[in-house]
Design a protein with these regions (language model features):
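ABC-family P-loop ATPase nucleotide-binding domain
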Residues: 1-34, 244-253
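ABC family nucleotide-binding domain
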Residues: 22-238, 242
């Protein structure tokens, strides 16, 4: 069983496989995911080994059916693997139950989605406070941290605006501020520019690059090569396997 009583990063990292760098944030070994679709068994991921270190900016790419969405769901603790192991910041999450996964998800991961996922009747400030409500933070802590997070993404003068009073780029900035407010180990962005025009997309990617320069670990899931080019490392999935990793230029046949 996975240890759930270990609280310090050093203790958790000591339990990682010996060949894993001590600054690894994400480690997968032989990660597999299968689905039953009618009478057909679909192998969405087929033995993925991946290590992502602290303060990396990584793009996971691939065409439709490559397994990138499945990989995102597993990395984000939204799903569990059929086989294999997954460690997130030292937590062996591949063996955790639903309640423990939910706690890890809220603590360790900041999500940014293509469709923003903002509450339409709530202000930008209230939207950013939401993850801290789930974390049990006090009202003052929520307000102070949400204000700081919105200021960090350039929306210090838009805190009281509702989503329909903001542009698409501003709404995505609110979503990024919300993702950052709990100081997550990783920022996980799923097609974050998919609903934005090219100029606004460049602005959002520039923001990601600034956050990365400030020390944030970022994982970007995209099918767009020009967006992936902003990352410092690109991992290409094909047919559920790693076909290319720009950090090693290894091509799997």
């Amino acid at each position: 069983m996975a240890r759930t009583d270990i609280t310090t990063t050093a203790e958790r990292m000591a339990l990682l496989p010996a060949d894993v760098p001590r600054d690894a944030v994400i480690v997968t070994r032989n990660l597999q995911r299968e689905y039953q679709m009618g009478t057909e068994r679909v192998r969405a991921l087929q033995g993925v080994d991946m290590t992502i270190r602290k303060n990396e900016f990584v793009a996971i790419m691939g065409p439709s059916g490559s397994g990138k969405s499945t990989m995102m769901n597993l990395i984000g603790c939204l799903d569990t693997p059929s086989e294999g192991e997954y460690w997130l910041n030292g937590y062996r999450v591949s063996e955790l139950g639903d309640d423990a996964l939910a706690r890890i998800r809220n603590k360790e991961i900041g999500f940014v989605f293509q469709t923003f996922n903002l509450l339409p009747r709530a202000s930008a400030l209230a939207n950013v406070e939401l993850p801290m409500v789930y974390a049990g933070a006090s009202s003052k802590v929520r307000r102070d941290r949400a204000r700081a997070s919105l200021t960090a993404v350039g929306l210090g003068d838009r805190m009281d605006h509702k989503p329909n009073e903001l542009s698409g780029g501003q709404r995505q900035r609110v979503a990024i501020a919300r993702a950052l407010v709990n100081n997550p180990s990783i920022l996980l962005a799923d097609e974050p520019t998919g609903n934005l025009d090219s100029a606004t997309s460049e602005e959002i990617m520039a923001l990601f690059q600034r956050l990365h320069a400030d020390g944030q670990t970022i994982i970007l899931v995209t099918h767009e090569p020009d967006i992936a080019a902003h990352a410092h490392r690109q991992i290409m999935l094909k047919d559920g396997k790693v076909a290319r990793d720009s950090s090693s230029t290894e091509v799997v046949s």
